Amino acid sequence: AAPRLSNLMEDGKAQKTVQEIDKLLIQAKNFYENTSKYEGRGRLPGQDKFDIQVGSYSDTTEVYEDLRNFMTFNNDTIGSKWVSVFGNHDGSIFQDDEILPDLDNEGNIQCNNCPETRDAGMVEWYNLFNQSILESPYQDGHFIYVVIPGSGSGAEVVAPRIIIADAENPHYFHKIMDL
């Protein structure tokens, strides 16, 4: 009976993590629609602007390739390319998202026409969930994400794409949303 109960508990955790990822995606979509309405162009939580990536990926193919091998939370090589949804309070390997300054130290433009209302990704996520944090049901779990930047304008516009995963096993626990 013990192995069967253990399997049942693991199935429950898997279902719970997928439900939590779904909640994150719904809020990301709402955020995108609201920023589209109020800022003139939709962006996702943590994006300074629609055409700026979050994390270390610029295209989806690279993410897919890494997800094939990203099976544990402690994969430093791949994990360091991802951003924590609600921030790293334990100093883990995932990045914390920060606001990109309009100008770099040498006065070069980094974020042209970025919205004044933007904030760090973890703050934007935190506000989307009424100052609550969604926690992974897994001991080593942690919600992480990346945003592939949008591009173009007018009829040639390509919306950003978000990928959210549970660091317990991103290979199995991830979802991708096109907007």
PLM region spans:
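C-terminal juxtamembrane segment of a hydrophobic transmembrane alpha-helix
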Residues: A1-G12, Y32
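Arginine residue identity/basic-tract feature
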Residues: R4, K29, R41-R43, R68, ...
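Juxtamembrane membrane-water interface segments immediately C-terminal to a transmembrane helix
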Residues: D11-Q19
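Short, glycine/small-hydrophobic-rich surface segments
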Residues: T35-I78
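Intrinsically disordered, low-complexity regions enriched in Pro/Ser/Thr/Gly and acidic residues
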Residues: Y64-L179
